[in-house]
Structure formats: C-alpha cells, structure tokens
C-alpha cells in the first residue's frame, strides 16, 4: 500500500490525500493517517519528539520516517529518538515542516515506503 501525499499545508492545518479531515499535527504511513495528539505521550516542544511518538509509524513497515519540526522549528528531536529509528533500520529525515512535507511528498512520488510525523505550527 502506498503512502498518502500531503495535499496541503498552512499554519495549523494539514490535509492528507484520501482523508476528509484537517489536522493540526499529524502522523502518516503507508495506507493511512491520523491526528498526532501530543497528550498521548506527554510531548512538549522540549525535549520534543520521543520514541513513543514515532513508534506507531515505525511499526507500519516504513523505510524512511520524516519528522517536521514546525514552521519555526520549535519542536526538538533528541538524539535518542533518531537512534531508536535507526536501530530499526529506518532512515530518518528531520526538517522544518514545509521542507519536511516537500521531502515526504518527493519520497512518496519515488515509491518509497515513507511515514511521517508533522507539527504544523511553531
């Protein structure tokens, strides 16, 4: 199953191809997407994205996982999260969210089994 493209991105709003929902923050993987609710794992801008935040997407069999740190890159990504993914053989790309969406969509177009977690505000 292919990863859905990110159809649109603006401050505080993301749309994923194949979904009628608008997300503030979202997780995407081959065949699906959902809201990324930081309250589930106690995520805050610092220390940032934890392994628990990316575990669900990593378990979907992705080759690459793209992390969008926000429009102003306020969301941190500690080395422990990158190491968690790399130990599973997953290529990790950590970028400002607009750049992350471009990278993610380019990987989708190449047929890569890509997933992502994206923060669409600060």
Swiss-Prot record:
Residues 6-122 are annotated as: MTH138-like domain. Transmembrane segments: none annotated. It is found in: Cytoplasm. One of its GO terms (biological process) is negative regulation of apoptotic process. Keywords: Cytoplasm. GO terms for cellular component: cytoplasm. May play a role in preadipocyte differentiation and adipogenesis. This is Mth938 domain-containing protein. It comes from Mus musculus. The lineage of its organism: Eukaryota, Metazoa, Chordata, Craniata, Vertebrata. The gene is Aamdc.
């Amino acid at each position: 199953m292919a990863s859905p493209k990110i159809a649109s991105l603006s401050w505080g709003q993301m749309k994923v191809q194949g979904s009628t929902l608008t997300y503030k923050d979202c997780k995407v993987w081959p065949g699906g997407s959902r809201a990324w609710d930081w309250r589930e794992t106690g995520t805050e801008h610092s220390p940032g994205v934890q392994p628990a935040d990316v575990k669900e997407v990593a378990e979907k069999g992705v080759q690459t996982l793209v992390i969008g740190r926000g429009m102003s890159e306020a969301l941190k990504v500690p080395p422990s999260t990158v190491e968690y993914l790399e130990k599973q053989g997953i290529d990790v790309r950590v970028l400002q969210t607009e750049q992350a969406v471009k990278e993610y969509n380019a990987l989708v177009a190449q047929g890569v089994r890509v997933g992502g977690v994206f923060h669409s505000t600060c």
